[in-house]
Amino acid sequence: MDKAVLHDHLDGGLRAQTAKELAVKDSYKPLIEVENIEKFFNRESSESLEDYLEAFVHTTALMSSYDNLERIAFEAAEDMHMCGVTLYESRYAPLYSVNNDLNVEDVINAINSGFNQAENIYGIKSGLILCGMRNDKQNVSLVSEIAIDYKDKIIGFDIAGPEYNYLPSLFSSEFNNLSENGINLT
């Protein structure tokens, strides 16, 4: 039976082994020093969304190069394929990866390259949903403009992050602009 996964977190599904390998490669000490990385990333018993999201600080730190992003996207789609998924929609906040060596177009291209490699090997269709961080109005505004600029390379837009005190209604002008420009909203 074919399955679809809609609304997965790209930065929330790194393989533990990949996280460890990338941490060593990138000299990212907070994860190099973790003895049981699988346990570290298992946040199922988190008492709050904020506690659950704490692990994302470390995964996004590893998503700072084209090669890392491409690998992570490929492996995410590959893992979905191994679970019988044929349609995979993944969301990511691109500004977390922008740095002196990586612009937003590189971020989007790297993720799509990983997805395309997985499609060529496994036939899984994957798409990228860009996320603005709801606890940062400027971030949401900027990512919504990026979504419009790159609408041919993404499948939608979403807001992510802590929900308390950050209602979707705070971003109605961005949502209206996105809708007027044909961007799907999740």
Predicted regions and their residues:
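Metal-cofactor-binding active-site regions of metalloenzymes
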Residues: M1-I183
